[in-house]
Design a protein with these regions (language model features):
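P-loop NTP-binding module
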Residues: 1-199
Length: 199
């Protein structure tokens, strides 16, 4: 999903934009932006467990095409309790602080259906963009999202379908499979700050 806000930046020239990596299970923003993530790098998860940290000190400036436009708060070390952290008062307070400094804040989250982490984030969003990929996303996800809309859990909803091949017929078919996997494991005995991605 991180590719969606990055694409939108093309239309936000001159605006102050923050991208928050709130997928605390399988963070990918660093890969998309070419940032070499280390397991002990502080980020969102660090700020949510340690109120003494200064949020602004852990926000990165993006160079290259989006220099001067995009700031990023990376996910930080993978915690054992992502849903709890994202639903905490600490996260609410952090957003209240950051929104004073930015015109737009994008929150990249884990897939709604597979984990509960993203559910608490919905209440903060003015717009929820749900990203699906042709020949990739399981069609069984649709009823779940539709129920959230029907139950008014989502206020404003946008659906993005990407990966469509021009002239191909495959996107009319629905034999999709969702391939979201977690390349890590929890190590409760090691305390906070662990991680398997040391690249």
């Amino acid at each position: 999903a991180a590719s969606i806000p990055i694409r939108l930046l093309e239309n936000l020239s001159g605006k102050k934009v923050l991208l928050i990596g709130a997928d605390l299970r399988n963070p990918q923003i660093h890969n998309i932006l070419g940032y070499k993530r280390k397991s002990k790098d502080k980020g969102l998860s660090s700020l949510l467990v340690d109120s003494a940290l200064n949020p602004k000190a852990h926000i990165s400036k993006v160079m290259g095409s989006f220099e001067g436009t995009l700031d990023v708060l990376y996910s930080g070390p993978i915690p054992p309790n992502p849903a709890e952290l994202l639903g905490s008062k600490a996260f609410t307070d952090l957003l209240d602080l950051l929104k004073n400094d930015y015109d737009y804040i994008f929150i990249d989250s884990a897939p709604l259906l597979l984990v509960s982490d993203s559910i608490p984030l919905i209440k903060y969003a003015d717009l929820v963009l749900y990203t699906t990929r042709a020949d990739y996303t399981d069609k069984k996800i649709a009823p779940f999202v539709l129920k959230l809309i029907k139950d008014k859990e989502i206020k404003n909803f946008g659906l993005v379908l990407n990966g469509i091949k021009t002239g191909a017929r495959s996107y009319y078919q629905y034999g999709y499979s969702y391939r979201y996997s977690y390349a890590y494991q929890y190590n409760y005995g090691y305390g906070y700050g662990y991680g398997s991605d040391d690249k």
